[in-house]
Amino acid sequence: MRRTTILLAATALGLTPAIAMAEGKMPQMDFSNPLTGAQVVWMAVIMVVLYFVLARWALPRIGGVIENRHNRIATDLETARRAKAEAEHAVRELNLAIQNARESSQGAIAEAVNAAKERARAQTAALNDRLSAQIASAEAEIDSARRTAVGALAPIARDVASSLLQRLIGEAVEPGRIEQAVSALSTQG
């Protein structure tokens, strides 16, 4: 196809002077002048030589360069596709590793939280037991102190009651009756 195109172009180029002369518009193409014919012949010879030089030497080299370039581009595109596939695979693996690490860390955090809660429960239970024991001890001490205080108040209450009754009624009241009344009041209260 290239050769056909080149031959058609050469034929058109060769017919150009004749067409121009037929129209009478180009005096430099006047074939009645002997120099014009020689110039056209040399031009045709140069064109044929140029055609063969281009067809046999330059165009195959240019075609080789174009073919090499096409092969290089195809190779580069294939390399780029492989690199893209490897990069996508690496990104998928990275995302999977990140997801696994996230799940693992969330599991570790949950375990740590549960362990801390369990320790807090144990410490709370131990503290509650200790506080309950201290409260029971304090209540026992308070009860003992109250009994001691009430026990210490009984003789004072007897003496005060005896003195008051003696002043109120003017005579001494029997100590057994005062003891009985103080005992009855201390047990009620």
Curated annotation (Swiss-Prot):
Entry's Gene Ontology molecular function annotations: proton-transporting ATP synthase activity, rotational mechanism; proton-transporting ATPase activity, rotational mechanism
Record keywords? ATP synthesis, Cell inner membrane, Cell membrane, CF(0), Hydrogen ion transport, Ion transport, Membrane, Transmembrane, Transmembrane helix, Transport
From the Swiss-Prot or TrEMBL record, state where the protein is found: Cell inner membrane
Q: Which InterPro entries match?
A: ATP_synth_b/b'su_bac/chlpt (IPR002146), ATP_synthase_B_chain (IPR050059)
The task this protein performs is described as: F(1)F(0) ATP synthase produces ATP from ADP in the presence of a proton or sodium gradient. F-type ATPases consist of two structural domains, F(1) containing the extramembraneous catalytic core and F(0) containing the membrane proton channel, linked together by a central stalk and a peripheral stalk. During catalysis, ATP synthesis in the catalytic domain of F(1) is coupled via a rotary mechanism of the central stalk subunits to proton translocation.
Q: PANTHER family, per this entry?
A: ATP SYNTHASE SUBUNIT B, ATP SYNTHASE SUBUNIT B', CHLOROPLASTIC
Q: Which family does it belong to?
A: Belongs to the ATPase B chain family.
Q: What is this protein called?
A: ATP synthase subunit b 2
Organism expressing this protein natively: Acidiphilium cryptum (strain JF-5)
